[in-house]
């Protein structure tokens, strides 16, 4: 979630179209240079690493998007809060990050072989080049492997069901952390209150002793 920032001119950013045709298997995401002015129809992740680009371009993330995203007519409406923030990103080793980096770069390299085709054409199911489709399928298999799931990639309901369980586990963990923090805060407050009471009592005792001593003198 922290990757999303409001910047008009980052050094380099990955852009995600807010609306995308329901006919596409993958939302066409891309990188843009700092000279590009991004308008309100795009979300951007400044200085996005290629392994994040790869994860977001995987079928796993797109399956999640198809279930939780809003709609604009029949098109999907991507949201950083609903789709991105609630997606269960896997914990990655450096080796896995490097592998995803390579697969993400492979997708960009294959796209570059079709300079006369824009992303709309490249990601139209009827015109998507076979090498690009294979590059995505290779990425999809690697991402499923990283999640340590024996998913049937033709069955997105199975993928989403597991992602929903991961999401619920994250919520449970977050709630436990919140409860633990609140309990610790209450304990600190109780300790401070006890110390204040002891200080007050000690002061009162001194005052009483002083008063008694004065009375005895009199």
Briefly describe each language-model feature range.
Residues 205, 210:
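Functional cleft and adjacent loop/helix regions within the main domain
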Residues 1-198, 217-218:
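S-adenosyl-L-methionine
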């Amino acid at each position: 979630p922290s990757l999303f920032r409001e910047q008009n001119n980052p050094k380099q950013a990955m852009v995600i179209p807010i609306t995308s045709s329901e006919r596409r298997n993958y939302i066409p995401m891309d990188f843009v240079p700092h000279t590009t002015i991004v308008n309100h129809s795009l979300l951007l992740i400044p200085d996005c690493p290629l392994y994040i680009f790869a994860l977001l371009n995987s079928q796993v993330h797109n399956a999640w998007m198809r279930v939780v995203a809003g709609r604009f007519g029949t098109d999907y409406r991507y949201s950083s809060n609903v789709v991105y923030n609630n997606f269960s990103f896997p914990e990655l080793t450096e080796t896995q990050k490097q592998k995803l980096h390579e697969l993400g770069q492979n997708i960009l390299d294959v796209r570059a072989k079709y300079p006369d085709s824009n992303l709309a054409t490249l990601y139209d199911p009827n015109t998507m080049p076979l090498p690009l489709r294979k590059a995505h399928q290779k990425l999809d298999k690697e991402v499923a492997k990283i999640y340590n799931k024996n998913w049937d990639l033709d069955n997105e309901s199975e993928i989403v069901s597991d992602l929903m369980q991961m999401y619920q586990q994250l919520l449970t963990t977050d709630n436990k952390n919140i409860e633990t923090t609140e309990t610790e805060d209450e304990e600190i407050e109780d300790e401070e209150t006890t110390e204040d009471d002891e200080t007050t009592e000690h002061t009162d005792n001194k005052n009483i002793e002083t008063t008694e001593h004065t009375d005895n003198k009199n």
